[in-house]
Amino acid sequence: MAIISETSDDGSHGGVPNKKPEELHKNPKEDDHQEEEVENHPPIPRQIPQALIRRTVALIKRCHYPSLSLLSKAFRIVISSPELHQTRSSLNLTEPVLYALIGFPPHSFPNWFILNHNITRNIPLRLSAIGSLPPMNPGSAVVTIGYKMYVIGGLIGPNNPVKTVFVIDCRVHTCNYLPTMHRARYRAVAEVINGKIYVIGGCEKRYDDWIEVFDVVTGIWSTVPDRSHFMSSLPGGGFVTSVVMQNKIYILDATCGLVYDPIDGTWESGELGTTLKSYWYKPCCVIEDLLYSFDPYCLQGSPINVYDPNVMVWTPMMGTGIRAFPDLDYFECKMANFGGKLMVFGATYNNPVTDTWCIEMALIKGETGPILGMIDSMVPVLRSVYSPYIDLCRSVTF
């Protein structure tokens, strides 16, 4: 509850208030009667109900929440409450929020940045560093559920992977450690299926614990036996990247594409894996069960290709906006699903500074023909002296 104070505004300064001439002729009994009526009124509440605070805060744009949480304990309690997320959802006020993990090797480890997308006062779109979050371990896997990001494994030194897992609350930019995994992992696959986090690889394969599952409700890790012959071809057991389509985990290995169905514990590769890998590169994301990936070589005439798992075919994304891209290094770009729009992050190098660009694209799908990409915005959002490495970008909703 937030405490408010009452103040006196009777116009007196310690003495008897001056009366107007007409007040001198009033009947004192009338004044007594009015005082009795006032005394019978319910007292003014000295506390604002949490429900009222919550509904008021729900109307405020989420970009102000981290600053608002610093004002008082009452605001921190409301902003970090699950009820606020439920209130915003019921009012259809939830917003996608985009985070990027960017480092400047060898000068700094990757740090989290937030994209200020709907900021007020005509401040341009920009990436802002989040000082309250610690640097991330290289090679961590990151998944999102609602307004939370789960950071899994990574390296804390040369050849020293860790079992640690922590969760970031994006509403107030705080993090808390969770129970550790059974295995230490580096560049593992981590994806969410039916509200559970599946972690695959990132370590040498052992049949009994190469796959682990985290139940976010109970906070318990469990292992999934896997006696298949599928494994990573990379040293240390890591993978290039992964996505989820049709409740299956699609994995890009250095030599092939793999598909894991966690419901029945089966794997697919073969012809599917060959077709899947033909235009799949690390910069990728899934929007409405379609896989979007950069093709640095533009082999199909477009820098972005789209994979449909229903027909197992890659098609180039078209649109005049794609030809307007700045001179990005496509190998180092990153993609994200931003509320159904395609977000692209990439850098251009203009000595002595480097600009990191954000390109927001609306997707137009017809009954037939290729998907069209229309640019909504294309602006530099971060300028730096050192060359950035964009490790990943993720969107959350709150």
Swiss-Prot record:
It comes from the Eukaryota. Residues 43-90 form the F-box domain. This is Putative F-box/kelch-repeat protein At2g29780. InterPro entries: F-box/kelch-repeat_ARATH, Kelch-typ_b-propeller, Kelch_1. Residues 19-32 have a biased composition (Basic and acidic residues). Signal peptide: none annotated. PANTHER family: F-BOX DOMAIN-CONTAINING PROTEIN, F-BOX/KELCH-REPEAT PROTEIN SKIP4. Kelch repeats lie at residues 148-195, 196-241, 243-289, 295-342. The keyword Repeat applies. SMART domains: Kelch. Residues 1-46 are annotated as: Disordered. Keywords: Kelch repeat, Repeat.
